[in-house]
């Protein structure tokens, strides 16, 4: 689904990903061909995509945890909330205001920002990267789904993840990494 420029923004949407899964665990308890499913997701994907696509850099295995350790803020949810907002906002003030709604104080914000600059000096915050990242995620998920189709594996997209029968979860991990 594209709101504007199809080369820089857009997201893949399906009915499956709209099934409830927070309060009523419908989606994760759905069966594919009578089998339980596994959801395999990209970890810290917007950060990873920007570093890989724009700078040919690897974010490492645990970027949120690394940022938390470098900032002294060892709450993964706070780090994730900061990254999501800082990468999605068009400017620093908008990101800071959005972070406040997540309980991230100005002091925490500055510590997280400094940790990002130290660990990932090429990472660009406050440039509205979310739309491009979602577009890239959609392209990757489309490749994974088509590969599944070629191999007879049902593969359903869920935002930045895929749902597959549990017996194919290692296939999904491998295929997502190659895509």
Where do the language-model regions lie?
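Short, well-ordered loop/turn elements at secondary-structure boundaries
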Residues: 31-35, 150-151, 158-159
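Non-catalytic nucleic-acid-binding interfaces of large nucleic-acid enzymes and RNP effectors
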Residues: 1-27
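Catalytic palm active-site di-aspartate
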Residues: 41-42, 83, 154-166
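Helical catalytic core of nucleic-acid polymerases
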Residues: 17-128, 132-134
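Hydrophobic alpha-helix feature that most strongly marks membrane-spanning transmembrane helices
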Residues: 88, 146-153, 177
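Short, basic interhelical loop/turn and adjoining N-cap
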Residues: 73-74, 167-171
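Short amphipathic alpha-helix segments
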Residues: 132-150
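Polymerase palm active-site segment centered on the conserved acidic dipeptide of motif C
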Residues: 169-179
């Amino acid at each position: 689904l594209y709101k504007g420029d199809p080369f820089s923004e857009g997201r893949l949407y399906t009915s499956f990903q709209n099934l409830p899964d927070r309060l009523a665990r419908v989606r994760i308890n759905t069966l594919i061909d009578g089998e339980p499913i596994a959801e395999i997701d990209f970890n810290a994907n917007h950060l990873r995509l920007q570093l890989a696509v724009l700078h040919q850099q690897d974010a490492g295995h645990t970027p949120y945890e690394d940022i938390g350790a470098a900032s002294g803020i060892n709450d993964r949810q706070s780090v994730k909330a900061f990254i999501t907002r800082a990468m999605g906002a068009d400017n620093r003030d908008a990101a800071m205001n959005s972070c406040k709604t997540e309980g991230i104080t100005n002091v925490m914000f500055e510590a997280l920002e400094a940790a990002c600059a130290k660990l990932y000096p090429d990472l660009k915050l406050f440039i509205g990267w979310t739309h491009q990242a979602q577009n890239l995620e959609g392209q990757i998920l489309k490749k994974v789904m088509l590969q599944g189709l070629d191999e007879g594996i049902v593969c359903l997209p869920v935002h930045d993840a895929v749902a597959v029968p549990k017996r194919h979860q290692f296939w999904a991990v491998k295929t997502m990494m190659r895509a």
